[in-house]
Curated annotation (Swiss-Prot):
Recorded family membership: Belongs to the nuclear hormone receptor family. NR4 subfamily.
Gene this protein is translated from: NR4A3
Any one cellular-component term (Gene Ontology): nucleus
Tissue: Isoform alpha is highly expressed in skeletal muscle. Isoform beta is highly expressed in skeletal muscle and low expressed in fetal brain and placenta.
UniProt biased composition (Basic residues): 93-110
Source organism (scientific name): Homo sapiens (Human)
The keyword Cytoplasm belongs to this UniProt entry's keyword annotation: no
Protein name (database record): Nuclear receptor subfamily 4 group A member 3
Length: 626
């Protein structure tokens, strides 16, 4: 039997029809080791005659081998003589569009040549070899795919159950290419179609093209050829539109190892999908792709070196641009997720840094946020002063100033040099503990004064009113700042100068007042107030109506501005929960605790172990409620 090597690509003029090579090359692949003879179910996809015009003519595989074949000394496959069984004695016609200048008689022969039919009484009809093909006549039908317009012509229907197998021509490419691994566990072969290169594609109303048969690296059929199997498989990796065709569920042991091909990017998306119209591959999220590294929310792309959501990106950018300083009300290990990311800005910013967000990438110059555009022309002095400022501007400026003032008054470094959680913490005389108590109160007064000067509008008040407000609220500010900074759950108290002391070290000086401060701190931290609410709480504890003010009206206006900024912060949805009622309730509790503080100072004065500083003595007398 002669060795035949058929190539399908554009052929030079004068060559025989069987030796022509077409632009679309054929390749096969053993998709599963359990298959030897595969039957193609082509009825589900309804491939029209136009979609199969690039297939080789049946005359290529007719029984007569005469002179239309070129004999090659070395062939890839040695096939048996194919037998083509045609229903009703008529084979479907194949119309191939020649894209090169071929002889006219070749084109005429392609449209009218009929394959030879073997005798019906031959024994080969009962058991067809593996290289035989069975064609069944089927009427034209309307294609389900809108990309393929309906055309009249013979259609391939499904293969009969009695047919042992249906194969496509094997990959007889020259020169051969290197075989690559196969797709493990694949259930469906992929048929790829691509536009014919010589003629521009004519798009259909649904966006389809005149397509040619082009199986690529992921599209192939199994070709069991018995003992004369090939040692490698070749494929032409071309971009194409995939349309899956199912294989018949007929299995038999293989006589040779399967041929492997490179998996197509769309192979995974076609498994389990409808073979007629596979959907495009979806983005895989198994490796965490598409989630924010900070809070776990949806994230489209990377920001500042890490895949983050828009909320965490904006939070990180604002924090770096404004050089904001945050304070954690808990143990600096607050959970940061989609639901609780706004509760603690300190822990959120620390997590941004821990996941790898780079502060140096944030633009802090005059072009920040403009995405590379040139700065606009400077406005004239008349244009820079708006005739009527927008209402939200003053509250927003007030809120930013309050937060900045609170963070600036927070100690940068903590001093653990005197921290002692053991029983030796109570060492020392009572006078030393009382003196320590007075020193801590005195240091808080200086911090409160520098903090108050950064509040917008406070320095516009009369000097007498400024002094009165600071001195009247010094105990409230002392308790509030101590409650915000301290980790009272572990009995660690952080004072305004950064000194960290254990509860046992403060108990002899503070007395029972220390337990009241601890309870207030735990309740305040349970409210989950953000830094904006804490800043407003600190300001409202000082700027309020006091007896002896010279201009109480101006103090009331400043208090209303702070309250408006808090309401504006809550109305814009920036606060996680309603905060105004919580802030007002915390103010009431703060006043009660300050009364206990006055009682403690009064008791120490009566004890007279240590003379109080003059500033403490004056403040005590001025803040008495009688």
């Amino acid at each position: 039997m002669p060795c035949v090597q058929a190539q399908y690509s554009p052929s030079p003029p004068g060559s025989s029809y069987a030796a022509q090579t077409y632009s679309s090359e054929y390749t096969t692949e053993i998709m599963n080791p359990d298959y030897t003879k595969l039957t193609m179910d082509l009825g589900s996809t309804e491939i029209t005659a136009t979609a199969t015009t690039s297939l080789p003519s049946i005359s290529t595989f007719v029984e007569g081998y005469s002179s239309n074949y070129e004999l090659k000394p070395s062939c890839v496959y040695q096939m048996q003589r194919p037998l083509i069984k045609v229903e009703e004695g008529r084979a479907p016609s194949y119309h191939h569009h020649h894209h090169h200048h071929h002889h006219h008689h070749h084109h005429h022969q392609q449209q009218h040549q009929q394959p030879s039919i073997p005798p019906a009484s031959s024994p080969e009809d009962e058991v067809l070899p593996s290289t035989s093909m069975y064609f069944k006549q089927s009427p034209p039908s309307t294609p389900t795919t809108p990309a393929f317009p309906p055309q009249a012509g013979a259609l391939w229907d499904e293969a009969l159950p009695s047919a042992p197998g249906c194969i496509a021509p094997g990959p007889l490419l020259d020169p051969p290419m290197k075989a690559v691994p196969t797709v493990a566990g694949a259930r469906f072969p992929l048929f790829h179609f691509k536009p014919s290169p010589p003629h521009p594609p004519a798009p259909s109303p649904a966006g389809g093209h005149h397509l040619g048969y082009d199986p690529t690296a992921a599209a192939a059929l199994s070709l069991p050829l018995g003992a004369a199997a090939a040692a490698g498989s070749q494929a032409a990796a071309l971009e194409s539109h995939p349309y899956g065709l199912p294989l018949a569920k007929r299995a038999a042991p293989l006589a040779f190892p399967p041929l492997g091909l490179t998996p197509s990017p769309t192979a995974s998306s076609l498994l389990g999908e409808s073979p007629s119209l596979p959907s495009p591959p979806s983005r895989s999220s198994s490796s965490g792709e598409g989630t924010c590294a900070v809070c776990g929310d949806n994230a489209a792309c990377q920001h500042y070196g890490v895949r983050t959501c828009e909320g965490c990106k904006g939070f990180f950018k604002r924090t770096v641009q404004k050089n904001a300083k945050y304070v954690c009300l808990a143990n600096k290990n607050c959970p940061v997720d989609k639901r609780r990311r706004n509760r603690c800005q300190y822990c959120r910013f620390q997590k941004c840094l821990s996941v790898g967000m780079v502060k140096e990438v944030v633009r802090t110059d005059s072009l920040k946020g403009r995405r590379g555009r040139l700065p606009s022309k400077p406005k004239s002095p008349l244009q820079q002063e708006p005739s009527q400022p927008s209402p939200p501007s003053p509250p927003i400026c007030m809120m930013n100033a309050l937060v900045r003032a609170l963070t600036d008054s927070t100690p940068r470094d903590l001093d653990y040099s005197r921290y002692c959680p053991t029983d030796q913490a109570a060492a020392g005389t009572d006078a030393e503990h009382v003196q320590q108590f007075y020193n801590l109160l005195t240091a808080s007064i200086d911090v409160s004064r520098s903090w108050a000067e950064k509040i917008p509008g406070f320095t516009d008040l009369p000097k007498e009113d400024q002094t009165l407000l600071i001195e009247s609220a010094f105990l409230e500010l002392f308790v509030l700042r101590l409650s915000i900074r301290s980790n009272t759950a572990e009995d660690k108290f952080v004072f305004c100068n950064g000194l960290v002391l254990h509860r046992l070290q403060c108990l002899r000086g503070f007395g029972e007042w220390l337990d009241s401060i601890k309870d207030f701190s735990l309740n305040l931290q349970s409210l989950n107030l953000d830094i904006q609410a804490l800043a407003c709480l600190s300001a409202l504890s000082m700027i309020t109506e006091r007896h002896g003010l010279k201009e109480p009206k101006r103090v009331e206006e400043l208090c209303n501005k702070i309250t408006s900024s808090l309401k504006d912060h809550q109305s814009k949805g920036q606060a996680l929960e309603p905060t105004e009622s919580k802030v007002l309730g915390a103010l009431v509790e703060l006043r009660k605790i300050c009364t206990l503080g006055l009682q403690r100072i009064f008791y120490l004065k009566l004890e007279d172990l240590v003379s109080p500083p003059s500033i403490i003595d004056k403040l005590f007398l001025d803040t008495l409620p009688f």
